[in-house]
Structures are given as structure tokens and as C-alpha cells.
Amino acid sequence: MRKIHSVSCCFALLSTIFASAMPLLAQSRSDIVVPGTGVQLNQVGDDFEDETWDFIPNNPKSTEDIDENQRQPMGKSTNGRWYEGAKRGHPDIVKRVPTPPGGIPGSQGSMLMKSLYTGIPNRPSHKMHQDDFICNVQYRLGGTLKVSQSPNVTTRVFIPPLEEWENRNGPHFAFRAAVETTIMENKTKFLFSSKSQKDEVYWPGLFILRGTKQVEGKNVPYAYFRVRADRNGGDFLGPEIPVTGWWTLGLSFTPDGLVHYFARPGVEELRREDYIATSMPYGYRCEELRSFFYNVVN
């Protein structure tokens, strides 16, 4: 089923979001929240164990980022927990499948995401594009989560063997969040200028990439993480992925406005030693968590 080298695909299992039961009144810069800490918010996230789980694509998908065409209505899951990204559209295939070996003990269901035709439907560009699959957080909770509550998210992702990936270097998959801050925007009218506050949304996260390196004189493919983003908005290098199969990924957001990134092989809960990095992407101080989502890149 997965041996199509031009397809980017990944499985997701048990995506969850947590927050502290009460807002934290103070937190030092050195306090890093391990994803999986706090009270699990059962209104959002998914374990994909329901045998009736399904996704209604409502094709053709949105490509607003390319041609400003959303193609309403948006795709959505039948349980109301997931929806198509209005900016870039949903993966070509989103469906419930049997959990691959090595998943959480007792799990019977996972979500498969797979794309071959990213970009504008029926108009191949021969360029790299990405699809979005978004967890319905903000609407199901009735609002955003303030970073005073140290919200954090975890997911289990099955990374297929490298020989099953699309044969190109670069990003193939990502686990990201939509977060919000407040910025000052300069406005000019005639000869006068002014400043006003504006809500700004940005999307930090972990990308999974394919690369090649020299081993005994041969180019050998390998996988690694890149982190979005540093203070200037640039991605920076994360650790290599020494083994494929199941990985647990996590993001946390703390009252000091920082974003923290975690990953470990397997499906066990994240620990402090699984920490990758802390950043203030784009120089923005994070204020609220709106959602988390997956990218499939092709």
C-alpha cells in the first residue's frame, strides 16, 4: 500500500492536548514544561480507535495560498475533531487504518495521511507544496488556550522506512501549532503615521526531512528534524532520526512566551531528556494556542 516513491505519507496515533488546571502565576525562564504535563483536555485530540471514524474530503481541496481559492465547503472528520486547512487544503488520502506494529499496546486504529497531488487540483506544478490537517481546538474549547496555563500537545507518529519515502531531499512531514501574539503595526495616512495593536498568528513546529550523507564513499539517505523557528524566523537544525517507526513528538508553550520542542523514539510518554530546543520564533512572545496540525509535503 505504501510503496509508492512519489508519495509522502505518515500515520498519526493518539494526538492529545494538555493544560494546567489553574493558570500559573509566575514561571522562571528556566522552567520548561514537558509535553504531556497537566490535565488532558478530552474535548480535543483523537485516538482513532472508533471504527466508524471517517474523513469527508469535500473535494476539490483548498489552495488559497496559491490561487486564493478556498473551494468551500472544507473537508472535515465525522467526529468533528479535524478539518481541512483553508490555506493549503487537506492531504489526498486521510483515513483510519490498522495501527502499524509497535504502536501503543492495545491500539487498533491510527490515521493515515498521504499526498501525491499537492497544490492546485488537476494542475500539476512539478513544485513542492504541502497539505494541512488541523485539529479542531479553538472551536471545540470555545476559545484559545492562554500560555499562562502552559498548554502543550503530544502526538505519536509512525515514520515509514526511508526506502518508502518520495525520492527527494527536503521536508516530508511536520507537526506544528498555530499560536498567537500581539504586535504593533505601523500605519501611514497622508503625512501622518500611527501605531496600532494587531493579532499575529504564526506556526512553530517540528519538520521531518530527508537528507543524504557520505558513508564509505556512498550517498546514503537519512532522516532528521528541523525546528521552526529562531528569533529571525529561520528554521534551525534538530537531531537526526536514527530509526524509523513510531516516534512521540511534543510542543509546549510557557507563560514566558517561549516554545519548547521534544521528540523520542517509540510511543512512551515524553521526558525531560527528550528535550530538543527552546525558542522564541520570529522574536514573538507567544500569548495563546489556537490549534495544532500536521503537514504532508510532496
Regions found by a protein language model. Name each.
Residues R271-Y275:
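A short, polar/proline- and glycine-enriched secondary-structure boundary/capping micro-motif
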Residues M1-I4:
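Positively charged n-region of N-terminal signal peptides that target proteins for export
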